């Protein structure tokens, strides 16, 4: 880990040194001169709550506008592609290609696919000519790979679909928890899973998945078998498909060094790949590798639905492109260049990277079913039960932001470009948009206002509500069927409830003002909404600890804060940026998450007493070990397994009493 961090820091400093030299003669726009940036930061300090990473984004954006798109994309990649309103009203990275030019966004509703490799080359070259430092894109790719290898499995998506279904499942053989996913019916990879009998855990070395027998309800935990990949692999996440008895490891895969003369030409241009490696686990003692697929770029995210894996990676183009060698600027899937017809061109006239999408039938795991690549300048995605929405924020004049969307349908592995569109404002995260009955509902922030927008299946605007919560910004959101909820925070902190039953006439039903704010929302049955966030002093804005809230949403026009629990010894949780870390099961009536205290990380397990309208603490235990992977709480029957890297600890879910543990 230390060596990886040193390498990352060296690469970052090298890139910054090059930027400094190349930007010495670059004229800086007035809005980004130091005195104006100081004013911007001072303005932010005066607000009651300012997310710490936003200051970093302001600085990163300044560098990007002076030096070019590539470095901003580097910053976006390591910040989880968070769109910030604090630089020119939106995602500075999207406007960095030419600091004095606002890019024209196409009004076409049709996604254009490339007619030739030459056309693709021109799009990328245009961006690189604007950026002035495209030669460092290759370094960005390689450095990103090192950092991703050292990080936890990404969610990425970040946060990010309708759902909030319980994180548990009941079968004839018993009950057990499942990964907390964004969209009901669409599975996501994780670093720990269970099939109700065994635990599957990625070790800290990121190359091994242990299969663990929990023994007598956690009193006799034993390692049963393992799957270990080669040193060129870094396991990001994995899936366990109980129907087909398959385990699929989604990995980052590093190619041989460029100096290796035996290396192929395609490997030279694609140093980092994303791989899906599938194992047959019918004999749990002896898993058998069945197949592998690869695609260009660093791992971004993945989904699994109906036995098909959908793999997403980010491939950044290098500055050493050769026009008549598409391999130097076109992604590869299973070692072959993607066809030009599979590449979706952006709604603006330039692009610096691809979101590469491949589908795999896990019953035939050595080949892909279909693939697409979305040429862009960096964005995020939301995956519904039928469609993939890829969105980017584009800076416009007068601190305005426009979010562009591209819609790709998926069904049984087949991918189809459907439509593109745009809306005012930027999205806080992927919980801020949702597909329902063919329509797409979005909550966005644009400069100092917030909006509700509804688009039809062709991404044409049906309706919108504007000028909401002036001077505030959206912190969290959630949709359930014909209703939506979002929390804003700035000087006041309301929870808005929205009636979406008539797509042509959405209505704001209520606005509940509450102290503090919820950074993560999760439906707890049909009439309750769970919020995990922070309690703050209403006058000073100083944090007073982690706040757990249960909202009564029985009457959407009169939402009530039914109960609140403040954990004043915790100063934050993982819920806001890693929703997979949350256990929320209304059927089991258990809420689990990890938080941070002065002594390290603490795992909390709560239950909610609906009759007395209060939270009750079952477990609040300091987590052993020191892992960078993230903490997971998984239950089988009535035993909770808290997993921290190579350490598993078992607790009784009713009493909180420890039952056993193991170090893998």
What feature does the model see in each segment?
Residues 8, 56-58, 67, 465, ...:
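Generic secretory/membrane-interface signal
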Residues 33-44, 55-82:
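Single-pass transmembrane signal-anchor helices and their membrane-water interface zones
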Residues 33-37, 77-664:
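Beta-sheet-rich non-transmembrane sensory/scaffold domains
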Residues 17, 59-67, 88, 147:
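N-terminal non-cleavable signal-anchor helices
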Residues 49-55:
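Bacterial N-terminal signal peptides that target proteins for export
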Residues 1-49:
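Disordered, charged N-terminal biogenesis/targeting segments of membrane/secreted proteins
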């Amino acid at each position: 880990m230390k060596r990886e961090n040193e390498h990352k820091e060296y690469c970052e400093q090298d890139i910054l040194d090059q930027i400094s030299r190349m930007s010495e003669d670059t004229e800086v726009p007035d809005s980004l001169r130091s005195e104006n940036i100081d004013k911007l930061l001072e303005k932010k300090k005066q607000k009651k709550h300012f997310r710490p990473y936003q200051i970093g984004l302001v600085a990163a954006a300044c560098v990007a506008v002076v030096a070019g798109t590539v470095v901003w994309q580097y910053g976006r990649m390591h910040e989880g592609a968070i769109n910030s309103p604090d630089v020119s009203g939106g995602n500075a990275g999207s406007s960095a290609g030419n600091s004095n030019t606002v890019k024209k966004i196409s009004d076409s509703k049709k996604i254009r696919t490339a007619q030739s490799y030459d056309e693709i080359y021109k799009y990328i070259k245009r961006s690189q000519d604007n950026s002035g430092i495209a030669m460092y894109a290759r370094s960005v790719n390689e450095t990103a790979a090192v950092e991703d290898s050292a990080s936890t499995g990404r969610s990425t998506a970040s946060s990010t679909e309708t759902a909030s279904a319980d994180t548990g499942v009941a079968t004839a053989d018993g009950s057990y928890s499942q990964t907390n996913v964004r969209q009901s019916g669409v599975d996501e990879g994780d670093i720990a899973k269970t099939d109700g009998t065994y635990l599957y855990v990625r070790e800290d070395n990121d190359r091994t998945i242990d299969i663990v027998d929990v023994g007598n309800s956690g009193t006799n935990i034993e390692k049963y078998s393992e799957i270990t990949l080669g040193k060129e692999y870094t396991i990001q996440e994995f899936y366990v498909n109980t129907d087909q008895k398959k385990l699929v490891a989604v990995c980052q895969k590093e190619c041989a060094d460029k100096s290796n003369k035996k290396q192929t030409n395609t490997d030279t241009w694609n140093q980092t790949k994303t791989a899906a490696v599938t194992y047959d686990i019918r004999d749990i003692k002896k898993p058998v590798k069945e197949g592998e697929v690869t695609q260009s770029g660093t791992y971004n995210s993945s989904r699994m639905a109906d036995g098909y894996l959908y793999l997403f990676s980010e491939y950044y183009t290098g500055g050493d492109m050769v026009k008549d060698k598409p391999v130097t600027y076109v992604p590869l899937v299973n070692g072959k260049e993607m066809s030009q017809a599979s590449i979706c061109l952006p709604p603006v006239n330039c692009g610096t990277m691809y979101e590469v999408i491949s589908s795999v039938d896990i019953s035939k795991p050595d080949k892909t079913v279909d693939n697409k690549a979305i040429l862009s300048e960096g964005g995020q995605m939301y995956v519904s039960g039928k469609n993939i929405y890829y969105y980017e924020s584009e800076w416009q004049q007068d601190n305005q932001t426009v979010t562009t969307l591209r819609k790709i349908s998926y069904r049984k592995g087949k991918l189809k470009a459907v439509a593109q569109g745009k809306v005012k404002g930027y999205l806080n995260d992927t919980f801020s948009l949702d597909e329902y009955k063919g329509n797409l509902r979005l909550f966005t922030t644009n400069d100092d206002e917030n909006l509700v927008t509804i688009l039809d299946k062709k991404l044409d605007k049906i309706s919108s509500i504007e000028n909401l919560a002036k001077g505030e910004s959206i912190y969290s959101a959630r949709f359930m069927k014909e209703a939506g909820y979002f929390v804003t925070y700035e000087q006041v902190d309301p929870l808005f409830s929205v009636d979406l039953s008539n797509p042509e006439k959405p209505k704001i039903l209520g606005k509940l003002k509450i102290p503090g704010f919820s950074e993560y929302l999760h439906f707890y049955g049909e009439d309750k909404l769970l919020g995990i966030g922070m309690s703050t002093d209403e006058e000073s804005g100083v944090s007073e600890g982690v706040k757990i809230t249960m909202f009564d949403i029985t009457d959407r026009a009169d939402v009530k804060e039914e109960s609140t629990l403040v954990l004043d010894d915790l100063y934050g949780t993982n819920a806001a940026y890693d929703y997979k870390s949350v256990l929320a099961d209304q059927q089991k009536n258990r809420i689990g998450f990890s938080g941070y205290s002065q002594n390290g990380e603490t795992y909390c397990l709560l239950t909610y007493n609906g009759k007395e309208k209060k939270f009750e603490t079952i477990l609040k235990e300091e987590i052993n070990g020191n892992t960078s992977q993230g903490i997971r709480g998984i239950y089988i029957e009535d035993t909770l397994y808290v997993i921290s890297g190579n350490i598993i600890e078992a607790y009784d879910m009713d009493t909180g009493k420890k039952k056993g543990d193991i170090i893998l």
